[in-house]
Amino acid sequence: MLKGITFFLIISCLSVQLLSQEQDSIHEKKNLLQRMDSITNWKVSKGRSTFMPFIAPSYTPETSLMLTLGGLFTFMTKPGNKILSRSSIPFSIGYSVNGSLNASIRANIYMMSDKLRLTAEYWNKNMPDNYWGVGYINGRDIPQSDSTTAYHRKWQQFKFKIAYEVLKNFFIGINHDRNKTKSSDVNAVMEADSNYMLYGDDIHNSGFGLVFRYDSRDFPENAYKGILIELASTTYGILKSTTSKYKAYELDYRQYQTIVRKGSTLAWQLKTRLTRGDVPWTEMSMVGTPFDLRGYTWGQYRDFSSIFLLAEYRYMFGRKKPNGRGEMFGPFGFVVWTGTGSVTPEWGDFTYWLPNAGVGIRFEIQKRMNLRIDYGVGAGSTAFYFSFNEAF
């Protein structure tokens, strides 16, 4: 753990140097950042599009050390509309020392004076991976090795939700999820796994469903106050190309409270997922992703149902003088969080709970949009994440 914390601190320092373009003095660094901030603020105030590139290392148990290239593209679907939030499309592509090649795009687009909202994600992974089987006990007790868990996975997923505001803060919409997994170099233990034997090594899924949402957050990407309650249901197997037929239900509750001043926020989230039917081993409910219990191996804990609870405190440091937007808090901050989660074959029978905690550093690259550096600790594992916007 000490090595992980040391690595986290070293990378954080390198990130600051990269953002400052390694000028010769602290004074020049501050001037450069102020000029960049002024240019970005001017573009944002005029409703113009902006682009922020980055290159940075990250570390997770499933990918090992990875070098990632990416960027954040923001824009207004209708410049000059003060009611409308800025749309954002962060993306990244990374290659790791264990041969993983991962790419992702996550979009939040606001239209029609914020009455129509589109969220979309695309993932593409070609990587050595591990499969422990289904259930908490397997994830905990089966040792990770080439002969017990290792295999190679090619995975693609595209999903979106589009919702329309029918009443103030109340949205109704549809969602779609399409994914496919191709596994190879499977070990003997995995070949004998009943779930793997049932669904095989080439799995395709396509689902459609409904979304019901209450959203009073002041800014969805980085809320200071407000509540999100979202209920989504997805039915898979409608299309002939789908491997199996099943249903998935999700409930996502988030709340944000400003503490004393803006930039000091207490946020918490409760999310659960329930599946029913012929659910493939690739699409079981999971905890331990970069967006919930940060610090675990993605995919180690999976079952028909999952639940997790997170509480996170976010703080942006103050300024001596207000910036161009008249704000007294600066572009740097930190977060601390703690949480727990569980997986189970039957919803409500959550017997075993996974602990989680972590710390993070934030760099505001434009108004209310942060570069996220997180170090998470789980039960016997740690992970280091470099991404845009908050985990929730």
Where are these regions (language model features)?
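Bacterial Sec-dependent N-terminal signal peptides
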Residues: M1-S25
